[in-house]
């Protein structure tokens, strides 16, 4: 099926991916997000491509960097990264589960962030993060790569709760200040 199609497009349809980036730049985007969303080893393992994640992650960055060079050399490239594994669709994870998953997230995000930093992106963007522990692991791991980190938190409710019940204010309190935008 279409599982991980965006990761595979980085090598199978690189020109199309680059064109999408250039289209965003043409209409005034200052930042483009590399097509890294499905390029983590855990997600690619689900389709038998886990050992090829570095190739796909590099290709995603190369596509965005080429598009920037062709379309607007002053634009920024953010390496978008999804949570390394599918987060359990449950609320109230135990503290032990949160720590175990947080450690796993940290390791995978750190490795991915080092790779994309070496490629020359300007910022790392962990996207679609649903739990505070996962967000903290992602931001801390990506910061180790020496790049600025933006983070995308998914499904923030009007009452300030995150998708699985954590409170956004608790996340903000962890760093004291965090700029944010909303999507999803």
What kind of feature is each model-predicted range?
Residues 1-184:
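Domain-level signal for soluble alpha/beta catalytic cores
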